[in-house]
């Protein structure tokens, strides 16, 4: 049995190596020839599974993507060919939500506001959007949800129109797949008209899919904003419309920019790999399930003891102990600027940052000790490991 794996799937070679012969290759450059005599294909979102890719796949029986998103896979084609497909829904939800919180905490510090005074608009109430809402609930931060598909399916949560989101929310964060068809397409959902309707001083975050945001419209709006000719707008992009190619005129206008790593926490990547591995084991009728937590190293972060009830400053410090978006932003800008004028080098640099991404951890890696009156229960709901001090 031969299993072809994206080289950027952590722990995959070791796990799948227990089941057969493993071949690893860069996911973005996979070709039809690579799939000859391959029984199973394990990928991430950079690999487009379409007719061209599997045209020579003479033995392929199983395709797994270690990502929450599925829009890079032609599932109808796989079904037509009798090839089993699986994904890893929700594997990265914690990392993406923590990315958004880090961005907002830092922007709040820079612009002089408290995140607790803002209303957040969440577009897309799937795994990521729902988990972010759960985090905001833990902190008591108001938010509005928008997901017309979930609403039509009978989801009983309170949903709001895009018009309400634009009119009432200070922050809008997008967590949708990319779709061009159907009643509610998301391609260029964030377009010129959408941006024009935002509140003054709005903050826009896209950590979903690049083409959800019309990058040219966003660039125009940010240029007007920063020249004083338009409404003040702050934008954070983890994804770009034509990645791994990045518009270097847009880049300096962004508050923060990163190379599609919002969900790249070590726990999330381990979850994605183990979810796909476990489903492949089930496909093979092998009882060999693995827990993601069993693969993780001890986190190199300090434990924290609270001496008083936490406040904005405490929360900021705790969040930055785990993830400070400024670190990734600075490295990304340096790597992109030095490739100016060379599209091939830019694409390589973009992918290398993802391939060699540092071992970012989730809030659960920090143990916070404090008395009940110090608000530790809220930190526990946010994801931190909490020990109540009963002394």
Swiss-Prot record:
PROSITE patterns: D_2_HYDROXYACID_DH_3. Its EC number is 1.1.1.290. InterPro entries: D-isomer_2-hydroxyacid_DH (IPR050223), D-isomer_2_OHA_DH_cat_dom (IPR006139), D-isomer_DH_CS (IPR029753), D-isomer_DH_NAD-bd (IPR006140), Erythronate-4-P_DHase (IPR020921), Erythronate-4-P_DHase_dimer (IPR024531), NAD(P)-bd_dom_sf (IPR036291), PdxB_dimer_sf (IPR038251). GO terms for molecular function: 4-phosphoerythronate dehydrogenase activity; glyoxylate reductase (NADPH) activity; hydroxypyruvate reductase [NAD(P)H] activity; NAD binding; protein dimerization activity. It is found in: Cytoplasm. The keyword Cytoplasm applies. Keywords: Cytoplasm, NAD, Oxidoreductase, Pyridoxine biosynthesis. It catalyses: 4-phospho-D-erythronate + NAD(+) = (R)-3-hydroxy-2-oxo-4-phosphooxybutanoate + NADH + H(+). GO terms for cellular component: cytosol. Transmembrane segments: none annotated. It is an enzyme of class 1 (oxidoreductase). Pathway: Cofactor biosynthesis; pyridoxine 5'-phosphate biosynthesis; pyridoxine 5'-phosphate from D-erythrose 4-phosphate: step 2/5. The keyword Phosphoprotein does not apply. NAD(+) binds at residues 147, 176, 238, 263. Substrate binds at residues 45, 67, 264. The active site is at residues 209, 243, 260. GO terms for biological process: pyridoxine biosynthetic process. Catalyzes the oxidation of erythronate-4-phosphate to 3-hydroxy-2-oxo-4-phosphonooxybutanoate. Homodimer. PANTHER family: 2-HYDROXYACID DEHYDROGENASE YGL185C-RELATED, 2-HYDROXYACID DEHYDROGENASE-RELATED. Belongs to the D-isomer specific 2-hydroxyacid dehydrogenase family. PdxB subfamily. This is Erythronate-4-phosphate dehydrogenase. It comes from Photobacterium profundum (strain SS9).
């Amino acid at each position: 049995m031969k299993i072809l794996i994206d080289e950027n799937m952590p722990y995959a070679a070791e796990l799948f190596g227990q089941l057969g012969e493993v071949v690893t290759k860069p996911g973005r450059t996979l070709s039809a020839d690579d799939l000859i005599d391959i029984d199973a294909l394990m990928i991430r979102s950079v690999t487009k599974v379409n007719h061209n890719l599997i045209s020579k796949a003479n033995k392929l029986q199983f395709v797994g993507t270690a990502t929450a998103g599925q829009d890079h896979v032609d599932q109808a084609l796989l079904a037509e060919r009798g090839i089993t497909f699986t994904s890893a829904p929700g594997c990265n939800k914690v990392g993406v939500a923590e990315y958004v919180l880090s961005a907002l905490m830092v922007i709040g510090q820079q612009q002089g506001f408290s995140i607790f005074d803002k209303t957040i608009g969440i577009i897309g109430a799937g795994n990521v959007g729902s988990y972010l809402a759960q985090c905001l609930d833990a902190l008591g931060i108001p938010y509005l949800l928008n997901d017309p598909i979930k609403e039509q399916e009978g989801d009983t949560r309170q949903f709001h129109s895009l018009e309400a989101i634009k009119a009432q929310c200070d922050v809008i964060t997008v967590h949708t797949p990319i779709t061009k068809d159907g009643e509610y397409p998301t391609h260029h959902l964030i377009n010129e008209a959408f941006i024009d309707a935002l509140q003054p001083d709005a903050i826009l975050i896209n950590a979903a899919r690049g083409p959800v945001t019309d990058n040219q419209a966003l660039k125009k709006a940010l240029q007007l904003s920063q020249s004083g000719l338009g409404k003040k707008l702050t934008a954070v992009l983890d994804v770009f419309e034509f990645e791994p190619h990045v518009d270097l005129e847009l880049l300096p206008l962004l508050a923060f920019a990163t190379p599609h790593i919002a969900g790249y926490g070590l726990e999330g990547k381990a979850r994605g790999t183990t979810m796909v591995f476990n489903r492949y084991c089930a496909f093979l009728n092998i009882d060999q399930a693995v827990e993601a937590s069993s693969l993780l190293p001890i986190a190199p972060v300090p434990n924290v003891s609270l001496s008083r009830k936490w406040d904005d400053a405490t929360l900021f410090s705790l969040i930055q102990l785990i993830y400070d978006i400024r670190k990734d932003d600075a490295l990304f800008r340096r790597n992109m600027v030095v490739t100016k004028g060379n599209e091939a080098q830019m694409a390589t640099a973009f992918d290398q940052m993802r391939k060699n991404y540092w071992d970012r951890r989730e809030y659960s890696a920090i143990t916070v000790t404090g008395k009940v009156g110090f608000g530790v229960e809220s930190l526990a709901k946010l994801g931190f490991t909490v020990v109540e001090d009963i002394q």
